[in-house]
Amino acid sequence: MKVRASVRRRTADCQVVRRKGRIYIINKKNPRLKQRQG
């Protein structure tokens, strides 16, 4: 999980999810693209 100041979808498979006021990017096909906004 990368923690970044700004997150964006890297591929079409990425999903943008809001949990507890934070924005997450999750990708089932390529889990190394997981991100969380700072």
UniProtKB/Swiss-Prot annotation:
Alphabetical GO biological process terms: translation
Name recorded for this polypeptide: Large ribosomal subunit protein bL36
Pfam families xref list: Ribosomal_L36 (PF00444)
Molecular function GO labels: structural constituent of ribosome
Keyword Phosphoprotein: no
Keyword Transferase appears in the UniProt entry: no
InterPro entries: Ribosomal_bL36, Ribosomal_bL36_sp, Ribosomal_L36_bact
Lineage of producing organism: Bacteria, Pseudomonadati, Verrucomicrobiota, Methylacidiphilae, Methylacidiphilales
Gene giving rise to this polypeptide: rpmJ
Cellular compartments per GO CC: ribonucleoprotein complex; ribosome
Family: Belongs to the bacterial ribosomal protein bL36 family.
Source species of the chain: Methylacidiphilum infernorum (isolate V4) (Methylokorus infernorum (strain V4))
